[in-house]
Amino acid sequence: MKTLALFLVLVCVLGLVQSWEWPWNRKPTKFPIPSPNPRDKWCRLNLGPAWGGRC
């Protein structure tokens, strides 16, 4: 019974390690950090002036 509990704990820890990435291993995000200005966001999405896309 004790070995089963130990095995379950090991599986949980391994799952956590798999899902958690090292900070230096993290892939760079595709998009830059969005600015707080929503108009600038629409501008970058190229939706045009009708959607507040004036640059």
Curated annotation (Swiss-Prot):
Please report any disulfide bonds recorded for this protein chain, giving both cysteine positions: 43-55
The similarity annotation says: Belongs to the Drosophila sex peptide family.
Q: What does this protein do?
A: Male seminal protein which triggers short- and long-term post-mating behavioral responses (PMR) in female Drosophila. Binds initially to sperm where it is later cleaved to release an active peptide within the female reproductive tract. Signals via the sex peptide receptor (SPR) in female flies; may also act via other receptors.
Q: Identify residues that carry Isoleucine derivative.
A: 33
Encoding gene per record = SP
Protein name as it appears in the record: Accessory gland-specific peptide 70A
Site Cleavage: give positions.
26-27
Knockout mutant characteristics: Viable and fertile. Males are able to transfer sperm but can only induce weak PMR behaviors in females.
| Species, as recorded | Drosophila melanogaster (Fruit fly)
GO annotation terms (biological process): adult feeding behavior; G protein-coupled receptor signaling pathway; multi-organism reproductive process; negative regulation of female receptivity; negative regulation of female receptivity, post-mating; regulation of egg-laying behavior; regulation of female receptivity, post-mating; regulation of juvenile hormone biosynthetic process
